[in-house]
């Protein structure tokens, strides 16, 4: 679970994880890792809301002083002759955060080789959906929104706003490298995340942008 404001204060990162422990999990011998995702803007929530309510932006709302003027009757970015492109992200945020940090300075989580993890991920973003990417690690989705589910194995799991997932991961015993867990912003290259690091492993620098756009969230996992 997680606790958060139900007003514009939530956009100011007024939120925190709320983990309700189940005594039945005590015998699992697994390390818990919690990741709280946020979208962050230097603009105030009131400014962001006003931009969304404006009828002149036409699409995703630029911020940071970008010029909103122009010929509204002309071609818009992302529009083809066949019609308007899908409107995925309403706000262009300044950063995406995992546990209040970007990939410029990510949280490094110490882990044991061969250990088992329960990764609890909370999408606390106000207006951003993510695909969670475990990279070379395969995980097992075991709970959604705090409720157990039939386990689903995979390396990527979609998350919409406000959603929570629990993923169980077994680390290799010969683990010699650090492994990032990334949150890929829907339909774009922006990303955030944390890094799992066994003792002695080097941590490579990760950029805040991927080489290609992340997928658009759909209902494939629920099928």
Question: Which residues are covered by each model-predicted region?
Answer:
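A short secondary-structure junction signal
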Residues: 15, 46-49, 131-132
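Hydrophobic or amphipathic alpha-helical targeting/insertion segments
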Residues: 1-36
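Histidine- and aromatic-rich segments of cupredoxin/plastocyanin-like copper-binding domains
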Residues: 39, 77-219
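Short, intrinsically disordered/low-complexity patches at protein termini
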Residues: 25-27, 59, 142
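Short, charged, solvent-exposed linker or helix-capping segments at domain edges/interfaces
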Residues: 28-32, 46-49, 206-209
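Polar, glycine-rich mid-to-C-terminal structural blocks
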Residues: 33, 37, 41-98
